[in-house]
Regions:
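Bacterial Sec-dependent signal peptides at the C-terminal "C-region" and cleavage site
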Residues: 3-21
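Sequence signature of WD/YWTD-type beta-propeller architectures
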Residues: 16-341
Length: 341
C-alpha cells in the first residue's frame, strides 16, 4: 500500500530509526526562480503552499495553480490545512480578494469555504476564526502592513457544518470604525487574540494597530493588551497559553523598499511584561511558536532575489538560524508536530 503525504514522511523517519519530527507548512515561490519581491503582481499570483520537516528538509509542494495560495494553518490533528486563495476572484474584484479553502494535509480535496483571510483553527479542530469585511463575505483587508483597507471583523465558523449544511459564519467583533484582523485562537479555546486599528488610520504607511483579545463566543468587550504609537501584527499564542508572540513595528521603514521595520515581541496573556526578542532593523513578520514552545519560526526580508526567507530562533531570541534559502521567497509558516496524529 502506498502511503501519501505526512504518513509517508512519518514512515520514512521511523524506517530510518529516528523519532518523528515536526512539520512546517509555509508559502513559497521556489517553483518560479524569476520572481523578486519587486514584482508584486506576479509574486501574489505565484505563491503556493508547501510542506517540509521542521529542520527545513524534504520540502514539497501541495498546491499548484495559476493563482495565489497563502496563509496556511494545519488543523490540531494534522489532517487538514486551511488557507487563502484568490483562485475564485473575478476580474472586477481587487487583486488581493481571497477566499478560504480547506484541503487534506497531503494537498488533496481542495474545497472552497467563504470569502475571508488568515484563518486559525480552534484547539478542537472544529471551528475556524478568520477576518473578512463587516458585510460578511466581502473584500477582506490587505495583509500587507500599512496598506489602506476597509473595515473588517473577526468571524468564526464550524467548518464541517458549513460543508454539510452551508451553515454560515458569524462575527464576534462589530466595530464599524475598526479593522480587526490576524486572529489566533487560544490553546484553551476560550479567547481569540487579534489585531485592530481604525479604518482611517492609514496615513504615512504607518498604522497604530494594537493587540486585543476577545471571548471566542463574542460575549463581552474586547480587551486591549498593547498600547503603543507603533504597529503590532500577527499575534500567536504560546502552546501553554501564557504568552502571546507578535510582530512589533519599531523604527522607520527599511531602506530600499516599502517594507517597514518589524521586530519580534512577546507579552504575557494579561498584557504585562512586553519583551522585545529581536533588534535587527529589518522586516520580521508572521512569527509562530513551535509546538513545544521552545522555538519561533518567522520570515525576514533579506538582501538579494530571495527577499523573504524563514528563520528560527529560541523562545528567548537566541540561537538564530536560517531555515530556507533562495531561489524563491519563503514565508507565512505554521509549525506542527508530525507525531501528534
Amino acid at each position: 500500500m502506498k502511503l501519501g503525504g505526512l504518513a509517508a514522511l512519518v514512515a520514512s523517519l521511523i524506517t530510518a530509526g529516528q523519532a518523528p519530527r515536526s512539520t512546517i507548512v509555509f508559502v513559497s515561490t521556489r517553483h518560479d526562480t524569476t520572481l523578486t519581491a519587486a514584482d508584486a503582481v506576479r509574486l501574489f499570483s505565484a505563491a503556493e503552499i508547501y510542506l517540509m520537516n521542521g529542520d527545513g528538509t524534504q520540502a514539497r509542494r501541495l498546491t499548484e495553480n495559476a493563482t495565489y495560495d497563502g496563509f496556511p494553518a494545519l488543523s490540531p490533528d494534522g489532517r487538514r490545512i486551511i488557507f487563502d486563495s484568490n483562485r475564485s476572484r473575478t476580474d472586477a474584484e481587487p487583486f488581493n480578494t481571497s477566499d478560504l479553502f480547506v484541503m487534506d494535509a497531503e494537498g488533496a480535496h481542495q474545497t472552497a469555504l467563504v470569502r475571508g483571510s488568515s484563518a486559525t483553527w480552534s484547539p478542537d479542530g472544529k471551528m475556524i476564526a478568520f477576518h473578512a469585511s463587516a458585510s460578511g463575505h466581502g473584500q477582506p483587508i490587505s495583509n500587507n502592513p500599512g496598506a489602506a483597507t476597509t473595515d473588517s471583523d473577526i468571524w468564526i465558523m464550524d467548518v464541517d457544518n458549513y460543508l454539510a449544511h452551508r451553515t454560515g459564519p458569524h462575527n464576534i467583533t462589530r466595530n464599524p470604525a475598526a479593522v480587526d484582523d490576524d486572529p489566533d485562537w487560544s490553546p484553551d479555546g476560550k479567547t481569540i487574540a487579534f489585531t485592530s486599528h481604525l479604518v482611517t488610520d492609514v496615513s504615512d504607511n504607518h498604522l497604530t494597530a494594537e493587540i486585543y483579545v476577545v471571548n471566542a463566543d463574542g460575549t463581552g468587550t474586547p480587551m486591549r493588551l498593547t498600547s503603543n504609537a507603533e504597529e503590532e501584527r500577527s499575534p500567536n499564542w504560546s502552546p501553554d497559553g501564557a504568552r502571546i508572540l507578535f510582530a512589533c513595528r519599531r523604527g522607520a521603514p527599511v531602506a530600499g523598499g516599502p517594507f517597514p521595520s518589524f521586530e519580534l515581541c512577546v507579552i504575557n496573556a494579561d498584557g504585562s511584561h512586553l519583551t522585545r526578542l529581536t533588534n535587527n532593523a529589518v522586516a520580521e513578520l508572521t512569527p509562530t511558536w513551535s509546538p513545544d514552545g521552545l522555538q519561533i519560526v518567522f520570515h525576514r526580508r533579506i538582501a538579494g532575489p530571495g527577499s523573504f526567507q524563514l528563520f528560527v530562533i529560541n523562545s528567548d531570541g537566541s540561537g538564530e538560524r536560517q531555515l530556507t534559502f533562495p531561489p524563491g521567497i519563503n514565508g507565512f509558516a505554521h509549525w506542527w508536530w508530525t507525531n501528534a496524529r
